C-alpha cells in the first residue's frame, strides 16, 4: 500500500472531487483515478 495513494484518497474525500484533489496534489486527474483504483483493489472494496 502506497502512502501517496492514501494521501490522494484523503484529498478526494475532503474535496469530494477527483479533479480538485489532483490540482491540489499536483497530479493529473488520471493519476488520482489510478491511485484510488489501486487502493480499492488492495482493500477489496469500492471507496467511491
Regions found by a protein language model. Give the residues of each.
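Residue-level preference for short helical/loop micro-motifs built around acidic side chains
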Residues: 5, 20, 46-47
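The N-cap/first-turn positions of alpha helices
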Residues: 2-5, 29
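Short helix-boundary/capping micro-motifs
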Residues: 12-26
Amino acid at each position: 500500500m502506497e502512502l501517496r495513494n492514501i494521501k490522494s484518497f484523503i484529498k478526494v474525500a475532503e474535496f469530494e472531487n477527483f479533479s480538485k484533489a489532483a490540482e491540489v496534489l499536483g497530479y493529473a486527474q488520471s493519476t488520482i483515478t489510478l491511485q484510488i483504483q489501486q487502493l480499492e483493489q488492495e482493500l477489496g472494496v469500492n471507496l467511491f
